[in-house]
Amino acid sequence: SRIGPGLVVLLGVSRADGSGQARKVADRIHKLRIFGDDEGRMNEALGDREVLCVSQFTLYADTTSGNRPGYREAEPGETAEPLYEEVCELLGARRGVFGADMEVEITGDGPVTITLEV
C-alpha cells in the first residue's frame, strides 16, 4: 500500500489491551494536533490526510535482560489481529498484511515519531 501526506501508524497490541481500546486509539489519532499549520507549528489534526497502518508486535519488546528481546507483553496474533483490523477500519487506513514480514519505506516530514498509549 502507498499513501500521500498523512500518518504511518506502527500499531502494537499488548496483552493489557481490550476490545474497547480500538475506538480510543482511533479517536486519539484523529484528534492529535501533530501536523504543521501555515506558520509551521504543530496545530492541525489528521483531517483528510491518509493513514497507513502496519502491525508491529515488536513495540512491546522487553529488553531488560539478556541479548534477545522477549515479547510476552505482546498480544498473540490470533487475538491481536481483530483489534488491529478494527483500528484500521475506524481510521479508514490502508494497511499492511497483519503479521507478515514486509519492507516498509517511510519518508518522514520532520521527522516526528510519537508513542501513543491509551
Which residues does each predicted region cover?
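N-terminal, polar/charged subdomain of small-to-medium soluble alpha/beta proteins
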Residues: 1-66, 78, 82-118
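Short hinge/gating elements
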Residues: 66-74
